Design a protein with these regions (language model features):
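Sequence-structural signature of the catalytic-core scaffold of metal-dependent phosphohydrolases
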Residues: 1-114, 127
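Short, charged/polar, low-complexity loop and linker segments
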Residues: 42-47, 167-172, 246-254
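Secondary-structure capping and boundary motifs in well-ordered enzyme cores
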Residues: 51-59, 115-119, 123, 152-160, ...
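Divalent metal-coordination and catalytic microenvironments
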Residues: 64, 189, 267
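Hard-cation-handling environments
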Residues: 99-152, 170
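Zn2+-dependent metallopeptidase catalytic domains
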Residues: 132, 207-208, 279-283
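Substrate-recognition/cap regions that form aromatic- and gly/pro-loop-enriched pockets
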Residues: 139-240
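C-terminal amphipathic alpha-helical interaction region
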Residues: 213-281, 285
């Protein structure tokens, strides 16, 4: 469980100005306020200091970097967002020295095809680099306080990795057809969240009526939205508000916080396709 938490920093409730004062992964927050007791207990059982990563997180992060940076460009070529010629021109123009030139030359000459060879050889070198960094900085990584990713520095393979990310940002993700998909997704999420927000506007007593299966004509629309919520998330909400949490000054504050979490967890658990279908349903499209 600790290895799944990429950003173990907790929210800055009393010092919002603290955001941006750190760099790298320490500047991001990955633990909800409600999850703090669980992560604290997890850290105590594993010997992790507050805000420190589990060592396996660094390996998982490196694996993500290796797989996605290559897959994004390969997928862009397969979908004809970018031609192989355009990709090669961008990579050659990066001027990463002999390592890049040799990697491209051998991949183009390979009988298996460009991407299989490119992916295999770059992955091999990146895995070796990650392993070397992990061993070299073993003590800092085991402490959970290592501030960087494993794949950093001036090593040729790391420089190529950075170049692949830059090419993806500038020549794939900024293409009109890709941005159109992002706008469609943004509109869908915004529409779903805006519609379900009416459940947050309800007084606690009215939301309790929905939980009890009651509600008059004034809750006509809210009741139908409520019926679409996941039973699993509703169960988690009921458990969270069943007993008083001393971290909240008021019971109403606790209830509303977990109602927000209920909707947030429900929406964030949607697949892209489901979120779009939900948006169309709620919009009458």
């Amino acid at each position: 469980m600790a290895a799944l938490c990429k950003y173990p920093q907790q929210p800055l409730l009393h010092n919002p100005q603290g955001y941006g004062q750190h760099h790298g992964w320490t500047s991001k927050r990955g633990i909800f306020f409600s999850e703090q007791p669980l992560y604290r207990a997890l850290g105590q059982s594993l010997g992790l200091a507050p805000g420190c990563r589990h060592p396996l997180v660094y390996i998982m992060e490196a694996a993500d970097d290796i797989s996605y940076c290559i897959a994004d460009l390969e997928d862009a070529v397969d979908r004809r967002i970018l031609t192989q010629g355009e990709l090669l021109a961008a990579l050659r123009g990066a001027d990463e020295g002999d390592y890049m030139a040799t990697l491209l030359e051998e991949a183009l000459a390979s009988e298996r095809g460009f991407f299989p060879h490119f992916r295999q050889h770059l992955t091999r070198d990146l895995v070796a680099l990650a392993a070397h960094t992990y061993v070299s900085d073993h003590e800092a990584i085991l402490s959970g306080a290592y501030p960087r990713a494993l794949l950093h520095g001036q090593a040729p393979a790391a420089q190529v990795l950075d170049t692949l990310k830059q090419v993806a940002r500038e020549q794939v993700f900024m293409r009109p057809e890709v941005e159109a998909l992002e706008l469609e997704g943004y509109a869908a999420l915004r529409g779903v969240l805006s519609t379900y927000a009416c459940l947050l506007a309800l007084p606690a007593a009215q939301f309790e009526r929905l939980l009890a299966g009651n509600g008059g004509s004034e809750l006509f629309f809210a009741r139908r939205l409520f019926h679409r919520l996941s039973a699993r998330h509703l169960k988690a909400y009921r458990l969270a508000v069943a007993s008083r949490d001393p971290r909240f000054d008021y019971g109403a504050e606790q209830e509303w916080y977990y109602r927000v979490r209920l909707l947030l967890d429900y929406v964030s658990g949607m697949t892209d396709t489901y979120a779009l279908e939900e948006f169309r349903l709620l919009s009458g499209i």
